[in-house]
Amino acid sequence: MAVGDDDLENRMSAKDRGIGSRGGDRNRIGPPPLPVALSSSTEFGDNALSSRWTSWLVPMFVVANVAVFVVAMFVNNCPNHFESHRLRGHCVAKFLGRLSFEPLRTNPLFGPSSHTLEKLGALEWSKVVEKKEGWRLLTCIWLHAGVIHLGANMLSLVFIGIRLEQQFGFVRIGVIYLLSGIGGSVLSSLFIRNSISVGASGALFGLLGSMLSELFTNWTIYSNKIAALLTLLFVILINLAIGILPHVDNFAHVGGFVTGFLLGFILLARPQFKWLAREHMPQGTPLRYKYKTYQYLLWLLSLVLLIAGFVVALLMLFRGENGNDHCRWCHYLRCVPTSSWRCDDV
């Protein structure tokens, strides 16, 4: 979807994640980035910024996510949950046999139970901190709560990621995607303790953040830069605003976005045009620096902030600190109470 079809960062309440008579699942749905900003900001620039690589990593990410979802459904084995079905209804799409979906009362996104997701590597504070299962910070971004969740995320990944990979190559975009996903998981774990989390929204917001910083650091080589900036800011603000609705985890979005934003300054700076054209210049022409001074400064500042941010956040997380104790207003990033809904148990 555009804004509404955005990335689903699914969060299920810890107290409801059991199966059978232990109660139902409650989903947190977060938005995937809007397909208007799907292409890189270079779309607004000159032809000299055209694609240079063939995209293969992003399609592989899509295949991997689909494969993991199929494995999750196989492990889930909905027809085997007899007690749960007696209380909540029957499996959906029974013709799929073992791969059929949980009853809609359990999971309205057409997917496995939260118990299965937890078993396969969903993000949960107690397991990450108390049981030292830090690998969940990475594995959770490959799991999806259902077909709707998976489809929205993969559609966003294809629209955003392929164009970026064509312009900057698989190494840089792969690093941004994975580190942004981890950054989103870390921030989410710092502020949310009563839910499990799956989904790639942190990684996808990281790609959006890198698009914005790439525009800033390469500002002088773009045409129509104001149009590009306004479009990106509009898309980003709309997506982040949706995150303040109930059952939407905005912390993963913000953490992924900030990580990707800093990585964009580090990995996506482009050489000046005069440097690229140096071979065609007359002999004896003084060589220009490959990058402008402000690009070097942004690179250094972003690298320091990124390393410091990860070190501080990980130390706080594994020491068991609660981010809400250090930021009294940050809970509003997760949900803003109104006359139409409450945020007490969100």
Swiss-Prot record:
Active site: 201 (nucleophile), 253 (charge relay system)
TM stretches of this protein: 55-75, 141-161, 168-188, 196-216, 226-246, 248-268, 298-318
Protein topology in the membrane: Multi-pass membrane protein
SUPFAM superfamilies (alphabetical): Rhomboid-like
Major localisation: Golgi
Gene Ontology process terms (BP): proteolysis
GO CC, one annotated term: plasmodesma
Top class in the EC scheme: hydrolase
Keywords carried by this UniProt record: Golgi apparatus, Hydrolase, Membrane, Protease, Serine protease, Transmembrane, Transmembrane helix
InterPro entries attached to this UniProt entry: Peptidase_S54_rhomboid-like, Peptidase_S54_rhomboid_dom, Rhomboid-like_sf
Superkingdom, taxonomy of origin: Eukaryota
Biased composition (Basic and acidic residues): 9-28
Catalytic activity, as annotated: Cleaves type-1 transmembrane domains using a catalytic dyad composed of serine and histidine that are contributed by different transmembrane domains
Any one GO MF annotation of this record: serine-type endopeptidase activity
EC numbers for this chain: 3.4.21.105
Subcellular location as annotated: Golgi apparatus membrane
Sequence segments annotated as region (Disordered): 1-32
Role played: Probable rhomboid-type serine protease that catalyzes intramembrane proteolysis.
Family affiliation: Belongs to the peptidase S54 family.
Name of the protein in question: RHOMBOID-like protein 3
Organism, as annotated: Arabidopsis thaliana (Mouse-ear cress)
